[in-house]
Amino acid sequence: MVKIHTVGGYSEVGKNMTVVELEEDAFIFDIGFFLPAIVSMEERDKVMTEKRLKKVKAVPDDSVISGIKDKIRAQFIGHAHLDHVGAIPFMSDKYNAPIYATPFTCEVLDSLLLDNDIILDNKIFAVKPNTSFYVKGKNRKYKVDFINITHSTVQTVMIALHTPKGVVLYAN
């Protein structure tokens, strides 16, 4: 079984979040902001929390994957734009899973964490574009490729998740 959960970013520009669910494992691709909501919120509120962000619909509504939260094994980030990486400081902690991103995207994420005085328990791994690596599932390892692609920010990658059912490509 391969099930794709379109959590955010499919009916609007922003709040990008996709989850690929397999029998025993699941993987997050991007957790981003809806920027117009962030701008209006920053004009009113100085402190951002997940609850406030969800109230103004600035982050993905991940309640649709609450039943598979314990299956999340990794979080992959495709590039450094805020609509793909911006909500990680506020939402990633609830998933006991490491974060994988390119070095530039990791620097942007580190800045977001510092700006919001947030320390994540998740390990963050910088992976160079055009690199393959393995992530641990419940009973198997999965090969992942970070494939360099062209975009309006540096170190953008298409992510290839190799599963027993085939390769899932993510290039949102």
Identify the function of each model-found stretch.
Residues K3-G8, F27-D30, Y142-I149, V167-N172:
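Active-site-proximal beta-strand elements of phosphoester/diester hydrolases
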Residues I4, V20, D30, H79-A80, ...:
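Divalent metal-coordination and catalytic microenvironments
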Residues V19-E24, I28, T156-N172:
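Metal-dependent phosphodiesterase/nuclease catalytic metal-binding core
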Residues K15, D25-F76, F90, D115-L120:
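Pre-active-site segment of Zn-dependent metallo-hydrolases
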Residues F104-T156, H162-P164:
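Metallo-beta-lactamase
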Residues K69-Y95, P103:
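Di-metal (Zn2+ and/or Mg2+/Mn2+) metal-binding site signature of metallo-dependent hydrolases
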Residues D25-A26, Y95-A97:
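A short helix->loop->beta-strand "cap" motif at the edges of active sites that frequently abuts
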Residues G32-V39, G78, T102-P103, L109-L112, ...:
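Conserved P-loop/Walker A NTP-binding site and adjacent catalytic elements of P-loop NTPases
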